Amino acid sequence: MQMLSRVEVMERMTAAEFFRDAPEDRKAELIDGVMIIPSPPLVIHERMQNFLFRLLADFVEVKQLGEVFGSRTAVELELFYAPEPDILFVSKDRLYIIGEKGIRGAPDFVIEILSASTAQNDRGAKFRAYERAGVREYWLIDPYGPTGTEFYQLEEGRFRPHAPDAEGSLSSVTVLGFWIDLAWLWSGQEYPPVRQALNTILDAG
């Protein structure tokens, strides 16, 4: 189980202080003014993160749509919030929000892969912060199965559920032409080869 460590301070830490003081050698997030340092993730989490990151990044590169970052890129959303999403996408029209130390503003698309210790924040404080900041699309994916998995798109300033189609495929609303077959995610952790999945997506478009 992935565990969380909270770095307690007398006063809430600001995003500027977080970018200055956060450790460079491990993942850390600023949630409501508190620096949270998770323990190393489980293998099941990393396998899913690796598959989705490579698939999305390769698609975005082929289509020249923007840039994709992994779980060590901090995002300054608000004064007291600077999460490090598992996967994020910034469209080519908004690359100016990418700074030397991280992202300054809302990414277009965020994916969080749930764990027992992070799900509460992913569905709670971070969900609300992403929504307030204007993240246009938010996927919360449970590596153990579809039951806890949720997909959202921003409509009139609020996250609304975004459902897969009748065939079990989910199309992104921010990365045009990108979609996933949900069966790829829960097939005994035997993910299809990334190149094979990418070609399936490209051939369908």
Give residue spans per PLM region.
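Gly/Pro/Ser/Thr-rich low-complexity, intrinsically disordered segments predominantly at protein N-termini
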Residues: M1-G205
